């Protein structure tokens, strides 16, 4: 950890260098995901491509960005589904994607062939996701009307459902005890999405497109239903 003179000027203190010094592994495996997220909402993020790929540690991207336009919930939902599409790290395009553009690589992230170490990307959307969520605060409404958009399994092939802060019960599909990590349940949302997702992985370029149509319709319908 970097320790500075407490009497020194504030501008000499670098929070990121003190608490998270950049190296290839942390940037390519962590910062790159933030870069991909920023890239969906802000302009000029492509100038930090070399940093996100771990090639230029000195050209650090900003800690936060100003979105080009007001960010709506659906934009955030979809940013959670990113696999670096349209970038040099696009996981649908390299040899690991196979014949059906599968944007997933099984762990570990790095592997060795003939003495050369190679790297698999770690995208925003990953196959090992247990659950994911987006919190929506609406300050003009009572606190009880806040919404937690909640989903299970892979974000790219599952949908988000609005759950109000005032909710007093849990539906059976999300309830504790309805299935487990090792026990399949046909009424568990996790297991149903997990099953669908695993089918999609076999013919990803074809099946995921159909899943996305249903996902978009559901989320857009729900967004209209919760408008205030």
Where are these regions (language model features)?
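Conserved small/polar residues in nucleotide/adenosyl-binding loops
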Residues: 1-6
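Core active-site phosphate/anionic-ligand binding loop and the adjoining beta-turn-alpha structural block
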Residues: 8-13, 19-21
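Accessory, solvent-exposed terminal regions and/or long lumenal/extracellular loops of proteins
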Residues: 20, 27-29, 33-116, 122-124, ...
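Substrate-recognition/cap regions that form aromatic- and gly/pro-loop-enriched pockets
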Residues: 97, 101-227
């Amino acid at each position: 950890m970097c320790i500075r003179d407490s009497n020194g000027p504030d501008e000499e203190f670098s929070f990121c260098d003190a608490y998270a010094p950049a190296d290839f592994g942390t940037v390519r495996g962590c910062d790159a995901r933030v870069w991909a997220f920023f890239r969906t909402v802000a302009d000029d993020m492509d100038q930090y491509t070399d940093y996100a790929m771990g090639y230029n540690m000195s050209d650090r991207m900003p800690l936060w960005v100003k979105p080009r336009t007001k960010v709506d919930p659906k934009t955030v939902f979809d940013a959670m589904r990113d696999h670096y599409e349209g970038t040099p790290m696009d996981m649908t395009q390299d040899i690991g994607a196979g014949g059906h553009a599968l944007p997933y690589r099984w762990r570990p992230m790095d592997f060795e062939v003939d003495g050369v170490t190679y790297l698999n990307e770690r995208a925003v959307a990953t196959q090992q996701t247990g659950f994911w969520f987006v919190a929506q605060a609406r300050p003009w409404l009572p606190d009880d009307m806040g919404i937690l958009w909640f989903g299970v399994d892979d974000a790219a092939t599952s949908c988000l459902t609005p759950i109000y802060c005032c909710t007093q019960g849990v539906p059976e599909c999300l309830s504790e005890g309805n299935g487990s990590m090792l026990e399949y349940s046909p009424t568990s949302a996790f297991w149903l999405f997990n099953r669908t997702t695993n089918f999609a992985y076999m013919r990803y370029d074809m099946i995921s497109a159909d899943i996305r149509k249903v996902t978009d319709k559901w989320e857009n319908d729900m967004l209209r239903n919760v408008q205030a």
